[in-house]
Amino acid sequence: MISLVIPTYRSPEILDICLKSATENQSKKNEIIVVVDGFAEESSHILKKYTDQITILTFKNNKGMQTALNFGVMNASNETICIINDDNVLCKDWDKIIEEDLHPGNVLTINQIEPTGPGMFNFPVKDFGQPSEFKYDEYLEYEPTIRHSRLTVDGGIFPFAMSKQDYMTVGGFDTMYQSPFICDWDFFLKLELTGKTFSRTSKGHFYHFGSTATKNGKDGAMFKATEGPAADLFEYKWGIRPKLYANNSHNPKTGEIIKGIKL
């Protein structure tokens, strides 16, 4: 079994689609943990629809994505965890795909379909509409047509599956970041420094609406303002700016391995 961890923040419409896909498209019953990161009243009517199929953890006030994820993983009862955002739509047999392609010491990214592109992460592009008019059945019909079994090494991004023990070994996501951005780069860098490997599977593709509650949502301006300070914190901590280097655990200027925090 897999523990699927879904942090959610003020996005009831897409959360409904996410949970519908997670519950309907699993090949067997898994643990689905929803961490409500504040404003619980806005999504309570959605959560009630799935109350017998999910575990709900609620913060009265917004604590941030990092705290929500760490809390969700701490409460996961399975060793294999999968972390997604509430703006993901899961494909058929998502759990079977993870079980087939995730190996010990590996962090497995599940490929995504983006509505616009091309982007920096080289995701396939096809627009299935806004949440209010999302073409759910069309997505499920189209997605298998672009699957292939070749694993690639361009992982280290959301959504991803891994071992709970590996997640806890590096302390999860660093809550020093007061932003939903950059903290994931920090997390994957810590994993790389402990020798974990990264891969991406295209046996399945989750759909991604994209930052509906952060960059593009009702609190978008507030969240965008946190990205710069988060990048500064990353540089203070690691000595390099957060960028997509081929090997982010090495300083691109010197080639030397970064041993720890730069104080």
Predicted features along the sequence, with ranges:
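Active-site donor/metal-binding and catalytic loop motifs
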Residues: 178, 200-221
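A recurrent flexible, glycine/aromatic-enriched loop bordering the glycosyltransferase active site
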Residues: 66, 139-162
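A conserved acidic beta->alpha catalytic loop
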Residues: 36-45, 89
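A short, conserved alpha-helix in the catalytic core of glycosyltransferases
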Residues: 154-171, 177-204
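Short, acidic, metal-binding catalytic loop of nucleotide-sugar glycosyltransferases
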Residues: 20-29
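Conserved donor NDP-sugar-binding/catalytic core segment of glycosyltransferases
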Residues: 92-130
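Short aromatic/hydrophobic "clamp" motif used to bind/position activated sugar donors
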Residues: 81
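Glycine-rich, basic loop-to-helix element that forms the pyrophosphate-binding segment
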Residues: 59-76
